[in-house]
């Protein structure tokens, strides 16, 4: 046999890996040819890879060649593998061809490349995690694994295109990539050039047609590929039939909440926001909103949960703000603490306690940790060269200095950190420094300060991380940042400042100094807990019984992952350290950054004045949560997500399910006689619910939200296929079928109301009130889909959950929050803003689908009111499409009255 491959031809990867697996089973000569060489004489265009058999026949399909090698090695075919191969050819390959073409030939990056394949990657990840198997077809590697690995390798070998949140896919890919046949194949084809090795080959390929709409819109219909076993169906049906009786008893409420031996005790913190800043949407999603979702989920799981946060009130920033506003630091703290609390209250953040750091408990606990570190030799004294403003007659703390960043040249870098490149800075390193108060140029002078001896504590920190990180849910960016700090070597870190507003340093000779915020801000979690309960040590000196989850943006990782653990380990007082450090990337605003001074972006105190409910803000921010990479808030996208995902998908299904109960069955849930198809639906929903649990337990908040929308789509499809509004008018069998469909649908709505609770608590409560969901079912989320609304249950009054966002409303808000960018914003016809091609394609498909529904109803001479309702939906979708395309809306001419 002779195998012809070509360097830079992606199809050569899987066949070489498969050939390596069959090594020694037959004589094989491998020849490298150019991509334009005609190996197969009867093909009209060049094709590689090609396998020439001993018989003289040729195989020139990648999967056929790989199958041949696997059969040689004794592998037996199975249906699931064949299904994966069909899917790879029809769905994955077109998407990958587009992604690789965009990346290699057109030089695109980021979501432009990942977008076409995101749906396919999510499907692979979902399938792997749901089956709980390491490989696609089971416990052992199969032909499907090699073919899909080879197809994906050129793209995913760059870690930035392997989404960290797709954990099962990540593990599968790394397992295969580490195998010797796969490594040799990659070396042969890519020649250590990475994906650029494919350029000569891809440049000769036709430009791919637009695939985004078909491949990315909405979510993959997993049920088309999922193979349900009889056992899975039986388990799902048995759980359904047990209903409410299978729910555990509600946890008794505690006040205060304290750890309980033998239970899962979950302590959750959000990074403490600086009191002097009004939080913008990026601050809210990065810390408090993400933590709130997990806290609400923890309570639904009946875990013993305490969720804390508070304002960080000491430090230079507060003194600076006090000067700007002509107030004392304490007055500034009092004023802005109330602003923060009001904002989080409006966003429905469910803190058990929201405190502050300007308290006696903060002083006591911080000074105690310092004294313990000092006594154990972990505090150093040294002279520091500092900037002093002679005009203001004082040393300038970091935030009182601005200048040019020595690393990236950013002209507005602070004396502690550059907001552009993110690097930490010593104030004296700034170029062209200026006093922030008087704008004069400061001089360099010496001052005695205290340092935390991080090098001396490094071994303890590394030992702790080695025990903590495996099996934990630290996000990838948090792991990377911590490893970078350790790799570069820890350095002594100054923990004092020449300020008045802060925790006093309890050491002779340093009475005129305070602790630096990096040292004592993270101790704020402890003091806030101490203000909540005098038994705070049961949470913070109890590492054996407490799971600590800390939520933050990535710039806070060093202080939570290095500085505080070093202090706590050095204090040797059995402190609870972070078990799971959850860090987000950054949320930008449209095409730029949030800026209060320039009036760009939505800040927390402004959101409530937009007329958009808090739950809609929560939904969109969580849907767009910057998990693996930075994301951006977009008004156009917010309109689209509200009108498509909430109004047309989720809200439409829940409203229809409830209305059918009210309209057809007098408000009482009808009897349900489940068919085999109904039982399969039960099982699909149970599996999706379990996937939701798996995701949230791993704190993959954004992906779990998509599970809710997937279940809602299942429900909409179920209603559309079974047409209960028609069956209710038929004979006894049809009416019974209408009852079953309606009863099952309204129970799906009840399940969704509980799954929604962490994300949209007000909407969740509204649904539960409309359905009159029994109290235990409102507060507990089981792992199986249960019948919580049995036959005979009476529901309440059903009404729509969501309102449509209009384009003129959103355009007005966009202009309002655009600051100086408003004048420069390019506009399309009639001043409208276009949506992205993915959204336009999705709307085009919805218009086509709805048009078919209208034509079908007219052909069947259905009820006029029903036709009118569907026509109204069609017109509304057409309007959304026109707005998305930036076209002026046509004025309806209507029919002339006679």
Curated annotation (Swiss-Prot):
A motif ('KMSKS' region) lies at residues 593-597. Pfam families: Anticodon_3, GST_C, GST_N_5, tRNA-synt_1g, WHEP-TRS. GO terms for molecular function: ATP binding; methionine-tRNA ligase activity; tRNA binding. SUPFAM superfamilies: Anticodon-binding domain of a subclass of class I aminoacyl-tRNA synthetases (SSF47323), GST C-terminal domain-like (SSF47616), Methionyl-tRNA synthetase (MetRS), Zn-domain (SSF57770), Nucleotidylyl transferase (SSF52374), S15/NS1 RNA-binding domain (SSF47060). The modification Phosphothreonine is found at residue 833. Residues 839-895 form the WHEP-TRS domain. The modification Phosphoserine is found at residue 825. The keyword Protein transport does not apply. Catalyzes the specific attachment of an amino acid to its cognate tRNA in a 2 step reaction: the amino acid (AA) is first activated by ATP to form AA-AMP and then transferred to the acceptor end of the tRNA. Plays a role in the synthesis of ribosomal RNA in the nucleolus. Belongs to the class-I aminoacyl-tRNA synthetase family. Monomer. Part of a multisubunit complex that groups tRNA ligases for Arg (RARS1), Asp (DARS1), Gln (QARS1), Ile (IARS1), Leu (LARS1), Lys (KARS1), Met (MARS1) the bifunctional ligase for Glu and Pro (EPRS1) and the auxiliary subunits AIMP1/p43, AIMP2/p38 and EEF1E1/p18. Forms a linear complex that contains MARS1, EEF1E1, EPRS1 and AIMP2 that is at the core of the multisubunit complex. This is Methionine--tRNA ligase, cytoplasmic. The gene is MARS1.
């Amino acid at each position: 046999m002779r195998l012809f491959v070509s360097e830079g031809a992606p199809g050569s990867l899987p066949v070489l890996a498969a050939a390596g697996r069959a090594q020694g089973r037959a004589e094989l000569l491998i020849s490298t040819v150019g991509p334009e060489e005609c190996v197969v004489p009867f093909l009209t265009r060049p094709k590689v890879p090609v396998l020439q058999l001993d018989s003289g026949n040729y195989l020139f399909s990648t999967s056929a060649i790989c199958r041949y090698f696997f059969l040689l090695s004794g592998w037996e075919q199975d249906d699931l593998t064949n299904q994966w191969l069909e899917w790879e050819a029809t769905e994955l390959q077109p998407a990958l061809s587009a992604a690789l073409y965009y990346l290699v030939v057109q030089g695109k990056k980021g979501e432009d490349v990942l977008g076409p394949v995101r749906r396919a990657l999510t499907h692979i990840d979902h399938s792997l995690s749901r089956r709980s198997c390491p490989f696609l077809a089971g416990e052992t590697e199969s032909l499907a694994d090699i073919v899909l690995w080879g197809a994906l390798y050129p793209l995913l070998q760059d870690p930035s295109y392997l989404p960290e949140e797709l954990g099962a896919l990540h593990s599968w890919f790394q397992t295969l990539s580490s195998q010797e046949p796969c490594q040799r194949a990659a070396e042969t084809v890519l020649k250590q050039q990475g994906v650029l090795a494919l350029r000569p080959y891809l440049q000769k390929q036709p430009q791919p047609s637009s695939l985004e709409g078909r491949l990315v819109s909405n979510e993959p219909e997993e049920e088309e590929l999922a193979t349900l076993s009889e056992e899975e169906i039986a388990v799902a049906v048995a759980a359904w039939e047990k209903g409410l009786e299978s729910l555990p008893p509600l946890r008794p409420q505690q006040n205060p909440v304290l750890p309980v031996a033998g239970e899962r005790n979950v302590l959750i913190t959000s990074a403490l926001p600086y009191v002097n800043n009004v939080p913008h949407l990026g601050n809210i999603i990065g810390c408090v909103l993400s933590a709130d979702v997990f806290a609400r989920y923890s309570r639904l799981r009946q875990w013993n949960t305490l969720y804390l946060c508070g304002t960080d009130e000491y430090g230079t920033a507060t003194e600076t703000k006090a000067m700007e506003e002509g107030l004392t630091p304490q007055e500034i703290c009092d004023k802005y603490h109330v602003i923060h609390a009001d904002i989080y209250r409006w966003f429905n953040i469910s803190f058990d306690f929201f405190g502050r750091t300007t308290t006696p408990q903060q002083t006591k606990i911080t000074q105690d940790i310092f004294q313990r570190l000092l006594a154990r030799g972990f505090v150093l004294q040294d002279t520091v060269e500092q900037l002093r403003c002679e005009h203001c007659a004082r040393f300038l703390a970091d935030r009182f200095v601005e200048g040019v960043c020595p690393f990236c040249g950013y002209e507005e870098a602070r004396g502690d950190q550059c907001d552009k490149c993110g690097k930490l800075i010593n104030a004296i390193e700034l170029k062209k420094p200026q006093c922030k108060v008087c704008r004069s140029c400061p001089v360099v002078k010496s001052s005695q300060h205290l340092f935390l001896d991080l090098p001396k504590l490094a071994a303890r920190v590394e030992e702790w991380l080695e025990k903590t990180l495996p099996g934990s849910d630290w996000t990838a960016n948090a792991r990377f940042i911590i490893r970078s700090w350790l790799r570069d070597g820890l350095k002594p870190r100054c923990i004092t400042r020449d300020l008045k507003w802060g925790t006093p340093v309890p050491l002779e000779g340093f009475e005129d100094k305070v602790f630096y915020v990096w040292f004592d801000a993270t101790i704020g979690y402890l003091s806030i807990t101490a203000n909540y309960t005098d038994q705070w040590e049961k949470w913070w000196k109890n590492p054996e019984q407490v799971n600590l989850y800390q939520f933050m943006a990535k710039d806070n990782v060093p202080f939570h992952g290095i500085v505080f653990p070093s202090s706590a380990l050095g204090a040797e007082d059995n402190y609870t350290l972070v078990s799971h450090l959850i860090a987000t990337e950054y949320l930008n605003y449209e095409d730029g950054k949030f800026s209060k001074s320039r009036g760009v972006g939505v800040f927390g105190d402004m959101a409530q004045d937009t007329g958009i409910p808090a739950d809609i803000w929560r939904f969109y921010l969580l849907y767009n949560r910057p998990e693996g990479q930075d994301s951006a808030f977009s008004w156009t996208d917010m309109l689209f997500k509200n009108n498509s995902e909430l109004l047309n998908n989720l809200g439409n299904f829940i409203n229809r399910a409830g209305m059918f109960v009210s309209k057809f069955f007098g408000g009482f849930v009808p009897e349900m006689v489940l068919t085999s198809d109904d039982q399969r639906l039960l099982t699909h929903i149970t599996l999706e619910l379990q996937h939701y649990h798996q995701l949230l337990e791993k704190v993959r908040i954004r992906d779990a939200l998509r599970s809710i929308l997937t279940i809602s789509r299942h429900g909409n499809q179920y209603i559309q296929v079974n047409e209960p509004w028609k069956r209710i008018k038929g004979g006894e069998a049809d009416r019974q079928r209408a009852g079953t469909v309606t009863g099952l649908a309204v129970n799906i709505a009840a399940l969704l109301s509980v799954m929604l609770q962490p994300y949209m608590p007000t909407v969740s409560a509204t649904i539960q009130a409309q359905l009159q969901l029994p109290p235990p079912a409102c507060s507990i989320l089981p792992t199986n889909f249960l019948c919580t609304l049995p036959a005979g249950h009476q529901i309440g009054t059903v009404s729509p959950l969501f309102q449509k966002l209009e384009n003129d409303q959103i355009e007005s808000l966009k202009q309002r929050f655009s600051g100086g960018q408003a004048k420069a914003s390019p506009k399309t016809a009639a001043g409208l803003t276009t949506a992205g091609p993915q959204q336009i394609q999705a709307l085009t498909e919805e218009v086509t689908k709805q048009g078919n529904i209208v034509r079908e109803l007219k052909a069947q001479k259905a009820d006029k009111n029903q036709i009118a309702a569907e026509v109204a939906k069609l017109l509304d979708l057409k309007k959304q499409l026109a707005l998305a395309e930036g076209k002026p809306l046509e004025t309806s001419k209507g029919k002339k009255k006679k």
